[in-house]
Amino acid sequence: MSGTLLAFDFGTKSIGVAIGQRITGTARPLPAIKAQDGTPDWTLIERLLKEWQPDEIIVGLPLNMDGTEQPLTARARKFANRIHGRFGVTVTLHDERLSTVEARSGLFERGGYRALNKGKVDSASAVIILESYFEQGY
């Protein structure tokens, strides 16, 4: 086991991507993947899996602040199930509440409005999701 994890912040137009190491508990953003109505370019995802060979995939689970599911929750679950079905890799869903808010805030602090590019926000959210997963001791 390499200890490498790949995280996705699922969205209908853009899917944020981050790579991280279990041993350090840190993650960094990778370029976001464009999606069309929630459907990604599966060849890009396959390339990411071949390049990074993660032990596990983390997919952010969008929930309302009270923990209930929202319309995007089922689509994120479906995305996670498809990754597992297509590539046979372990996929874990992880609560992503407030990850986008935190990502926007961090990017804005570092670069103002110009830094709030959609793909950058989505991949920064994926970093936050993965680091949150590590912080919970997984």
Curated annotation (Swiss-Prot):
Pfam families: RuvX (PF03652). InterPro entries: RNaseH-like_sf (IPR012337), YqgF (IPR005227), YqgF/RNaseH-like_dom (IPR006641), YqgF/RNaseH-like_dom_sf (IPR037027). Gene3D superfamilies: YqgF/RNase H-like domain. Its main location: cytoplasm. It is found in: Cytoplasm. GO terms for cellular component: cytoplasm. It is an enzyme of class 3 (hydrolase). Keywords: Cytoplasm, Hydrolase, Nuclease, Ribosome biogenesis. Could be a nuclease involved in processing of the 5'-end of pre-16S rRNA. Belongs to the YqgF nuclease family. This is Putative pre-16S rRNA nuclease. It comes from Salmonella typhimurium (strain LT2 / SGSC1412 / ATCC 700720).
